[in-house]
């Protein structure tokens, strides 16, 4: 078996870092995401607005996920623990990304995703970013302005708390 040279390994690592950095293209901070008249997994006939989904909190964790996405499935129980924590500072709202409502609803129930999950069937929400990979989590205020974002799954409750609090 042939081994990669140090130069080849460095080139592959640089390419991987470049691709990871391009997962959410463009400068997202300060961008406003419009969520209006959207259906949810729990109520496909609903026409939900971002402010309604905030549930009285000033910050929203908008999490793009799919039932097909292994890192998403690993992250959902952690987000569920955050939601169940004593005083979460943000409301979690899911966006079903490149997925159908049926598999999404099954995965949400199986993994404990009890929060509202928007059905982005036409990709209109994801196109505003644009989302190129999942999971992607945006920290929004109630006006839909992106305060911060994370590409890839959170690793701990402490990481989620630090992300929401801006530390």
Where are these regions (language model features)?
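N-terminal targeting signals for export/organelle localization
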Residues: 1-42, 153, 157-167
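Structural detector for helix-capping/boundary residues
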Residues: 31, 35-36, 67, 132, ...
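A short beta-strand-turn-helix
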Residues: 34-60
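Short active-site neighborhood of thiol/selenol oxidoreductases, capturing the structured segment around
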Residues: 51-73, 79
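A generic structural signal for alpha->beta connector loops
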Residues: 58, 89, 114-115
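Hydrophobic beta-strand anchors of alpha/beta hydrolase catalytic cores
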Residues: 61-62, 92, 137
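Structural microenvironment flanking redox-active thiols in thiol-disulfide oxidoreductases
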Residues: 73-111, 121-127
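Thiol/disulfide oxidoreductase modules built on the thioredoxin-like
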Residues: 107-113, 121-165
């Amino acid at each position: 078996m042939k081994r990669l040279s140090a130069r080849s390994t460095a080139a592959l690592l640089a390419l991987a870092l470049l691709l990871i950095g391009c997962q959410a293209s463009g400068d997202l901070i300060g961008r406003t995401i419009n969520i209006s008249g959207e259906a949810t997994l729990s109520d496909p006939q609903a026409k939900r607005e971002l402010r309604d989904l905030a549930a009285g909190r000033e910050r929203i964790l908008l999490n793009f996920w799919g039932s097909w996405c292994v890192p998403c499935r690993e992250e959902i129980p952690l987000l569920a623990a955050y939601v169940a924590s004593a005083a979460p500072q943000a409301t979690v709202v899911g966006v079903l990304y490149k997925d159908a409502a049926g598999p999404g609803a099954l995965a949400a129930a199986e993994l404990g995703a009890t929060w509202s999950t928007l059905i982005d069937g036409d990709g209109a929400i994801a196109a505003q970013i644009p989302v190129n990979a999942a999971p992607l989590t945006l920290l929004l205020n109630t006006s839909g302005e992106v305060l911060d974002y994370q590409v890839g799954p959170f690793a701990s409750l402490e990481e989620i708390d630090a992300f929401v609090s801006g530390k």
